[in-house]
């Protein structure tokens, strides 16, 4: 059985993000003796209770706009509660924002300074305009959506796209199972072979570094977490991918970085990958 129908490296964006995936508060100056976090720490327990109570009565709206990063700072005092309430969709918490796609059914957090891929945003706007249009759809030449194209992608503003995270959702048979390809190591090695063209390109080398399974026993879901690097004379890239099959869909989150920047961004990449969950 071949993985090629399910994993590929076909996407390339001409604007903010160029991907190579498989389907796969300012502090004032002065003599301050305590930091803002130390001053606020006695209020954390009280804040936790009030935040939980406030949600039930809608008083959480009193937090208001994120002026000067104040809201994000306060929520950062208790990041677990804020994230459980999905407040990081609106306000960054602990340096991360949340992406929730209720249509495709997944979520993850990503560095709050990153922005969405403009090509995908424009395409989504065009799709919405077409769906809301009163005009009849064209009878011919309707372009089929590329199933290997990410539904979301984020990266640092103004970057070349070498550092990014994206999610691809592909339709598969309801009976499709990643487990059929073997354990995490076998799956990882097969994906690396697919990414590198199964050895057909002598100048492209892939190495599987880590492979594991994160299991959601409550929902009977298995997330295959893979770390690998791809090297060629033109680039050296470090990837962390998460794959999960559910209800006739194959979900693949791929986070990548230049090998030269890996030591600086690996904590953010790992955090993003570990946060990926299916919510459908």
Curated annotation (Swiss-Prot):
This is PsbP domain-containing protein 7, chloroplastic. Disulfide bonds: none annotated. It comes from Arabidopsis thaliana (Mouse-ear cress). Residues 1-36 form a transit peptide. The keyword Iron does not apply. The gene is PPD7. Its main location: plastid. It is found in: Plastid, Chloroplast. GO terms for biological process: photosynthesis.
């Amino acid at each position: 059985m071949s993985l090629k129908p399910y994993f590929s490296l076909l996407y390339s964006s001409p604007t903010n993000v160029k991907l190579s995936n498989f389907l796969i508060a300012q502090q004032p100056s002065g003599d301050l003796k305590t930091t803002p976090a130390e001053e606020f720490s006695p209020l954390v327990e009280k804040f936790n209770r009030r935040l939980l109570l406030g949600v039930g009565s809608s008083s959480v709206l009193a937090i208001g706009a994120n002026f000067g990063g104040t809201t994000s700072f306060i929520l950062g005092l208790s990041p677990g509660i804020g994230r459980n309430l999905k407040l990081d969709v609106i306000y960054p918490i602990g340096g991360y924002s949340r992406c929730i796609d209720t249509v495709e059914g997944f979520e993850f957090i990503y560095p709050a300074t990153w922005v969405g891929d403009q090509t995908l945003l424009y395409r989504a706007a065009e799709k919405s305009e077409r769906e809301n249009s009163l005009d009849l759809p064209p009878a011919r030449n309707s372009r089929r959506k590329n199933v290997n194209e990410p539904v979301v992608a984020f990266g640092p503003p103004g970057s070349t796209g070498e550092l990014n995270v994206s999610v691809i959702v592909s339709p598969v048979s309801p009976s499709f199972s990643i487990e059929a390809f073997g354990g995490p190591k076998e799956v990882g090695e097969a994906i690396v072979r697919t990414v590198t063209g199964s050895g057909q390109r002598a100048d492209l080398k892939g190495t599987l570094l880590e492979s594991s399974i994160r299991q959601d026993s409550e929902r009977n879901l298995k997330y295959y977490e893979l770390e690998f690097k791809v090297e060629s004379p033109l680039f050296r890239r470090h990837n962390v991918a998460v794959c999960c099959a559910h209800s006739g869909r194959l979900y693949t989150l791929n986070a990548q970085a230049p090998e030269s920047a890996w030591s600086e961004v690996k904590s953010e990449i790992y955090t993003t990958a570990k946060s990926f969950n299916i919510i459908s």
